[in-house]
Amino acid sequence: MTPDIAICDSTFCDSLPKSLIANSGIDAITHAIEAYVSVAQNDFTKMHSLQALELLFQNLSESYHTGTVVSRDAVHRGATIAGIAFSNSFLGVCHSLAHQVGSTFHIPHGSTNGILLPHIIMYNASRKPTRMGIFPSYKYPQSYERYSEIAEHIGADRSDPQGLVEKINNLMKDLSMPLSFKEANIPEKEYMSKVEAMAESAFDDQCTPANPRFPLVSELKHILIEAYDSP
């Protein structure tokens, strides 16, 4: 369902709990990053993704801590622009897995995405993926270069995928968000008992085909296991 209009009125968030500001912002960042590396990306979506990420990384922390009108307005615009990007290029396996973990353990969607995103970035950044995504708009794997472009654009300390991961983790810490599912207080035994089912369901999620690296179920299981106690 794609909206015809978006009402970007930051006063709607005046009484919003800070945790929702953080979760919504990280979800928007995930939207923009996944849209940028999607197999269906194009010049228009790349432009929107980068502008969204610039606005979000520059303003989300201030929006969370002090809630100024300027920062809230910028985050609203960034989230909307990210929506324009992913509604035209779709998302990837970060959202595929987040849908399963969130619905199984009832933790916020933004937190789930934020925990998974660093693992997905490093998984997708492989220069020799097991298999590329279906019908990509490019000839060779490009995820490493695209994550590096994002890292450089947002001023990460390193212009490579690891630099992007560090930038995301530092923002998550600043927003008092968990960096692993263990930190999100999900019981380990219960979590591990659901890993296989969650991986299988994520494989069939509508977001998976747009991921730049077409996953094996075993690889999705590995990502879920890794994300339990490792940021």
Give, region by region, the residue ranges found by the protein language model.
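A glycine/threonine-rich phosphate-anchoring loop and its flanking beta-alpha core
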Residues: M1-Q41, R127, Y138, Q142-E149
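C-terminal and late-domain segments of enzyme folds
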Residues: K18-I81, A85
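Short alpha-helical scaffolding segments that buttress acidic/His motifs in well-ordered protein cores
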Residues: I29-I33, V75-G83, L97, L117-I121, ...
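Flexible, glycine/charged-enriched surface loops at secondary-structure junctions
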Residues: A40-H48, S63-A74, S89-C94, M132, ...
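Glycine-rich phosphate/pyrophosphate-binding beta-alpha loops
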Residues: T80-N113, D204-A210
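Gly/Pro-rich interdomain helix-loop hinge
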Residues: I107-S193
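Short, amphipathic C-terminal "tail helix"
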Residues: E190-P231
